[in-house]
Swiss-Prot record:
Keywords: Disulfide bond, Secreted, Signal, Virulence
Chief subcellular location: secreted
Name of the protein this chain belongs to: Secreted virulence factor MC69
Disulfide bonds: C36-C46
Gene null: resulting phenotype: Impairs pathogenicity. Exhibits a defect in appressorium-mediated penetration in rice leaf sheath cells but neither in conidial germination nor appressorium formation.
Entry GO CC: extracellular region
Subcellular location: Secreted
Region forming the signal peptide: 1-16
Gene source species: Pyricularia oryzae (strain 70-15 / ATCC MYA-4617 / FGSC 8958) (Rice blast fungus)
Purpose: Secreted protein required for appressorial penetration of intact host epidermal cells and for pathogenicity.
Record's note on what induces expression: Expressed in conidia an all stages of infection.
Length: 54
């Protein structure tokens, strides 16, 4: 039951183009004054910068 729910949720988010990808420093672009107020800016949007896995 839980697996079916998780699968349906993932399929729903993917079909809505809501996919969360970790942001690394290679993806960051220069910020404009009217860009998002938190995190860093990428060509796809903005979010928190992820550090290297330890």
């Amino acid at each position: 039951m839980k697996a079916a729910f998780v699968l349906a949720l993932c399929a729903s988010l993917a079909s809505a183009w809501v996919v969360i990808t970790p942001i690394t420093k290679e993806m960051v672009v220069d910020r404009s004054p009217d860009d998002c107020f938190f995190g860093v800016v990428t060509p796809q949007g903005c979010g928190p910068l992820r550090g290297p896995a330890k």
